């Protein structure tokens, strides 16, 4: 049976429509392909290309029918494409999917369809068709970007969270590697440095774990070569203040919970020999309630092992006298002997840095808006285990760089200056941001608002804004922008908290928000915080919300003055 060509084109048209609906209305986190894929990010080129294919197939379908002229078919197809594009935007708005009714996308749809439909007219009306085509091509050149480059953002996260960055900590120059990469990105964007080579140096004390990290529980006085060692990062980690030990061997001494309630038990423990003190995280949290003499005796133990429900690493500026490990409770199997080796090195005055760049304002360059994110993480634990830190905070750095790319474009040059601050040593206790506040590269009274970006790789459940209950008027403005554009499912205000780099600025009187997304991956300060775990479901929304909020504070491009006046 012979199938006519126009039926084939009709089938292909309907198939393409089904594919478009699937891609535009499927939540990003449920798609089998990463949402960083350009087609799913729906930037201008993607929209135009998708609708160009739709218009071409539709025109061939209608043109194959009897009585349909090429011009009439082109007109019907163009109107249908505009209507279909509008329908998609309405559905995205109602279903809270995709980019939530970015109507600039409809312009891209029309441009793509229009360019393809002009092709059949080139032979008969070449000059007119070329003129219209040139006009359509010129339209996007003056349009401001409406979304981040999600593919580029995901690549940024993947680079920063890669093994080559050594966890962006203080073993094997991890944070210096990350800083070198970010200097290159700032330079490529054409941002002006706020310090030589974008770098503000400072130093800190930090406890590190660069070498051996071994733990084994068995009944033999020797390490058992055929019995697997517990895996660092997966089954145990070093406590941040752990001291070193080489090939230690001791018996476990599980802490009796009666020491917290029975004075006789507490007194008996003051005279008991303690090998490896084994206690739960709940017991450890209550140690300060014990008699001082018993606390001192427990501190003299050969080693500490704390059983925890989840491994959550952190950093410290001090070092205990003995090794202290945190072991996943579900992986702990008590035996008669414990073998351990911990290479711990306390680095004094370790040299590190903040990075600082600026886009100078066109109207009020001495007034500043600040976008900040910390680029450091927890580094390594042993010679092989590293903490990727994809969500914390490669995601925030990626969003900062996307906003920097936006404001670096000449057509988006802000009225106020916009500073981009990449802080080091946040995980060590807000060291980098505190140093900046004490040694500011821009006058703190000239900062109109600071937006700190941290933990922005998810977003299925919206975002929380720390200090939203402090700066209520600014939070209402943020909420109004989010409601108008449906950037994120919801925004939640929170009070002040010393949980990221906004805090030293807030304490110094600088208005500041710290925004982080919720939902999705629960990995935090562990080896599972990897790029593949991040949906980036709220990344584009957080970008749009941050951009619009900063524009409202003074980052919106200044109006071009009429030279005739």
Indicate where each model-derived feature is located.
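N-terminal hydrophobic or amphipathic helices/low-complexity stretches enriched
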Residues: 141-193, 359-361, 365-366
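Metal-dependent peptidase/peptidase-like ectodomains
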Residues: 423-520
């Amino acid at each position: 049976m012979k199938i006519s060509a126009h039926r084939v084109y009709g089938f292909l048209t309907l198939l393409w429509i089904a594919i478009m609906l699937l891609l535009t209305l499927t939540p990003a986190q449920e798609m089998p392909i990463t949402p960083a894929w350009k087609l799913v990010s729906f930037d201008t080129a993607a929209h135009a290309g998708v609708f160009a294919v739709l218009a071409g197939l539709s025109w061939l379908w209608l043109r194959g029918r009897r009585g349909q002229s090429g011009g009439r078919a082109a007109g019907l197809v163009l109107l249908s494409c505009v209507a279909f594009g509008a329908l998609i935007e309405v559905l995205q708005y109602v279903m809270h999917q995709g980019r939530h009714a970015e109507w600039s996308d409809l312009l891209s749809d029309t441009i793509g369809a229009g360019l393809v439909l002009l092709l059949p007219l080139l032979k008969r009306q070449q000059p007119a068709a070329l003129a219209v085509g040139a006009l359509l091509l010129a339209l996007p050149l003056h349009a401001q970007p409406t979304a981040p480059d999600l593919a580029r953002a995901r690549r940024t996260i993947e680079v920063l969270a890669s093994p080559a960055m050594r966890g962006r900590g203080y073993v094997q120059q991890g944070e210096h590697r990350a800083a070198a990469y970010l200097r290159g990105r700032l330079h490529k964007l054409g941002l002006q440095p706020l310090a030589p080579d974008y770098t503000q140096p400072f130093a800190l004390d930090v406890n590190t774990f660069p070498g051996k990290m071994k733990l084994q529980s068995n009944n033999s006085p020797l390490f058992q070569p055929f019995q697997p060692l517990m895996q660092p990062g997966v089954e145990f980690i070093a406590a941040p203040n752990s001291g070193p030990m080489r090939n230690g061997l001791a018996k476990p001494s599980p802490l009796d919970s009666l020491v917290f309630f029975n004075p006789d038990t507490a007194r008996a423990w003051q005279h008991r020999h303690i090998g490896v003190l084994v206690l739960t995280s709940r017991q450890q949290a209550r140690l300060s309630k014990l008699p001082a003499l018993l606390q001192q005796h427990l501190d003299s133990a050969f080693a500490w092992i704390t059983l925890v429900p989840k491994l959550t690493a952190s950093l410290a500026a001090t070092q205990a006298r003995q090794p202290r490990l945190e072991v996943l409770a579900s992986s702990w199997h008590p035996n008669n002997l414990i073998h351990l080796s911990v290479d711990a090195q306390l680095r004094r005055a370790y040299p590190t840095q903040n990075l600082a760049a600026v886009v100078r304002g066109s109207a009020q360059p001495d007034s500043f808006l600040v976008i900040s994110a910390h680029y450091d993480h927890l580094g390594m634990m042993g010679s092989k285990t590293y903490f990727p830190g994809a969500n914390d905070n490669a995601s925030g750095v990626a969003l900062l760089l996307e906003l920097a790319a936006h404001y670096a474009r000449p057509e988006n040059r802000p009225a106020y200056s916009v500073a981009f601050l990449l802080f080091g040593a946040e995980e060590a206790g807000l060291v980098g941001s505190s140093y900046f506040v004490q040694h500011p590269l821009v006058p703190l009274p000239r900062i109109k608002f600071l937006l700190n970006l941290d933990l922005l790789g998810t977003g299925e459940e919206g975002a929380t804004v720390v200090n939203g209950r402090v700066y209520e008027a600014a939070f209402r403005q943020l909420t109004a922008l989010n409601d108008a554009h449906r950037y994120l499912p919801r925004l939640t205000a929170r009070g002040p908290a010393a949980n990221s780099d906004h805090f030293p600025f807030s304490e110094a009187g600088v208005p500041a928000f710290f925004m982080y997304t919720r939902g999705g991956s629960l990995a935090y300060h562990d080896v599972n915080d990897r790029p593949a775990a991040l949906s980036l479901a709220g990344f584009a929304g957080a970008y749009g919300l941050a951009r619009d909020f900063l524009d409202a504070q003074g980052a919106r491009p200044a109006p071009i003055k009429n030279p005739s006046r």
